[in-house]
Amino acid sequence: MALTREYKATVLARIKRDPKFAKALYTEAVNALLEGETDEGLSILRDLVHASITFKELAKQTGFGEKTLHRMLSRRGNPTTRNLFMVTRTICEELGIKPEVKLAA
């Protein structure tokens, strides 16, 4: 389902003003990636970057070029595990999230 521009703008605005929402979206992104829903997980991470750290700042902190990061987090992105972890760690730091792992039975 294609999202409307207004919906996207609403989500980005809420990420900026609601830390709990941003944390929930981060959790959703990681869960999607772990469940093999790569497109969805990368899309959510991209929204988090747009609304919080910005691609320019993420590039500065990770050492990747902005265009590389845009490609990495695109629907067709195929980041290596090392690069993806570097990006997610940087997003966590920016959002003040301390990840914890809980395994389901």
Where are the language model's segments positioned?
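Short alpha-helical DNA-recognition segment
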Residues: H50-R71
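Short, charged recognition helix plus adjacent turn
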Residues: R5, A9, I97-A105
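N-terminal flexible/basic segments that precede or flank functional cores
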Residues: M1-I44
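DNA major-groove recognition helix of helix-turn-helix/homeodomain DNA-binding modules
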Residues: R82-K98
